[in-house]
Amino acid sequence: RMETYMTARNSEAEIEEGLFRISVFDFDKRAFREALVNAFCHRDYTMLGRVRVEINDDGLVISNPDGFVEGVNINNLLTAEPHGRNPALADVMKRIGLAERTGRGIDRIFEGSLLYGKPMPDYSESTDTLVKLFIPRGLPDKAFAKMISDEQERIGRALPVNSLLILNELKRNSRCTITELADVIHSTEAKVKTASE
């Protein structure tokens, strides 16, 4: 039922990649799945409330009761050590193929937008009693997506999420300093240099 709901509201665009065309959806399907799995795996089941999914003209919203897991906040989402509130449930989700084995599903959520130069996922409305993810609708930046694809093909592997964050910020503001880029990835200037190589 959720897949039908999603498919009906998930517009598609195409990007030419050499002789091939790549479908790019408003909301990356893997990112959506990871966000939904995270909402169920990391919520506090002692609290009343539901996992909510809403797709509207502005974007996709997924929210769940309770705040982030202890030790995780909006500033370290991508850098905090992965650990869950419900490890048994997370393990079952991994075993049946719904969750990331690496415990880095949050990376997938960001990659779903960053790979195509689209607006970043936003957790800024999360509180101590609610985790709320907003993924804005946005057209892919075809030139940016091609540059990312070409670079990944050249190096023979996927770019890490920190590199994607840096490239996305440089696309937005080409005059960024290393210090500003360190703020973007919530890390050190040394890690910016490593991610940029």
Labelled PLM ranges:
Residues 1-197:
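C-terminal regulatory or interaction extensions
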